[in-house]
Amino acid sequence: MVQKILAVLMFAVMLTACGTENAEDNSISVSESAETTEDAVLTYEQISAEDAKKLMDTASDYIIVDARTTEEFAEGHIPNAILIPEYEIADRAPDELTDKDRLILVYCRSGRRSKIASQALVELGYTNVKEFGGIIDWPYDVVTD
């Protein structure tokens, strides 16, 4: 009987030792994961259509990027917007958006592509990117070509 109790105690000690080793390994992983997350913090700011309109009315130096397709842009876009489709941002932004600190307001149809385009701009080094969703939620004037 004493041997069985001793065997159970030894087994418990071994399990505890194994559990402690794994906990230490996990803490290292969590720490490394936190550092990775801190590096990925760079992002754009999401604002409402109303806030974007206020910036357009008050800011002196900004650019509006429409991240939709050429066809969608022709159907109607925000006045003074330039068309750079989301899938062309990486190729065209360096040539068309030369000041990386300039205020850039980005929109698309519903907000999905403008989020992708905005994050791509940030990853390219642009520092003042604001995404304001889609033109379907834009209650102000639009123009057509």
Model-derived features: where do they sit?
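Residue-level signal for mature regions of secreted extracellular proteins and peptides
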Residues: 11-12
